[in-house]
């Protein structure tokens, strides 16, 4: 079974609980501050043709639309795309794989992925190849993913093997290897290592089995704490990396 199909079946089993935890207002506040703002820094999104790849219900689409982008959501799950189209009628959902999207070459200004690439092992590089194909020259690939070679990843790897919330093929991305492979085709504009207290307990409340009713009470202080710690984080102590690449 291919990596995307494994993830689709896994997600379908946990979809209701997943959306409750990752789609609530507290998690969206986290995304906007620590994913979306650094991912799209310096990019005028107004009027751009954008793909949210592996879109789910469109958590990043919400931000992109607010900035004036025209968004297509791409996901392998037909049920997910139905939900996406219902939630974002001004956008278009396409049921297709990011490994072979069927979309026209050189046709999009930006592709955004939040937490999707690490679900694709061992096919991450194949996804980047497809993204490169559909991006216009000068187009952006913006992504946020758990990364290897960090202390949090050591814990994550131990946890993934023992927690049924994670599929067997989930693995943090090897950013150094990705950059070596694609150095001739992308300019690496931005790279920021982030993720500490609020990432763990606000965004990932489902992983820690935290009751949803508690999140509104502890979210504000943890967001503030994460903002204080973030400027001092590097690769070794961060939970994820935010990258902005540009097609040559």
Regions found by a protein language model. Name each.
Residues 1-45, 142-165:
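Conserved class I S-adenosyl-L-methionine
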Residues 51, 57-100:
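Class I SAM-dependent methyltransferase SAM/SAH-binding core
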Residues 99-111:
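A short acidic, Gly/Pro-enriched loop at the edge of an enzyme's catalytic core
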Residues 110-123:
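A short SAM/SAH-binding and catalytic strip from SAM-dependent methyltransferases
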Residues 125-137:
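A short glycine-rich, Lys/Arg-flanked "PGG" loop and its adjoining helix->strand segment in the class I
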Residues 156, 160, 190-248:
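A C-terminal cap/extension of S-adenosyl-L-methionine-dependent methyltransferases
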Residues 170-186, 190:
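Short alpha-helix
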């Amino acid at each position: 079974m291919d990596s995307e199909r494994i993830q689709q079946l896994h997600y379908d089993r946990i979809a209701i609980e997943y959306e409750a935890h990752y789609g609530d207002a507290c998690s969206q506040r986290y995304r906007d501050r620590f994913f979306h703002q650094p991912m799209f820094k310096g990019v005028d999104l107004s009027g751009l043709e954008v793909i949210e790849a592996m879109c789910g219900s469109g958590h990043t689409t919400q931000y992109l639309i607010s900035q004036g982008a025209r968004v297509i959501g791409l996901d392998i799950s037909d049920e997910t795309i139905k939900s996406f189209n219902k939630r974002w009628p001004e956008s278009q959902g396409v049921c297709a794989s990011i490994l072979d999207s069927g979309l026209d070459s050189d046709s999009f200004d930006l592709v955004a992925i939040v937490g999707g690439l690490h679900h694709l092992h061992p096919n991450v590089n194949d996804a980047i190849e497809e993204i490169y194909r559909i991006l216009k020259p000068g187009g952006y690939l913006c992504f946020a993913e758990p990364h290897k070679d960090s202390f949090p990843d050591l814990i994550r790897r131990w946890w993934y093997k023992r927690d049924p919330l994670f599929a067997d093929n989930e693995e943090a991305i090897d950013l150094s290897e990705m950059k070596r492979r694609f150095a001739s085709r992308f300019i690496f504009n931005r790279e920021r290592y982030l993720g500490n207290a609020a990432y763990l307990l606000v965004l990932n409340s489902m992983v820690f089995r935290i009751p949803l009713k508690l999140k509104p009470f502890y979210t504000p202080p943890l967001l503030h704490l994460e903002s204080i710690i973030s400027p001092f984080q590097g690769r070794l102590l961060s939970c994820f990396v935010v990258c902005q690449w540009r097609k040559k």
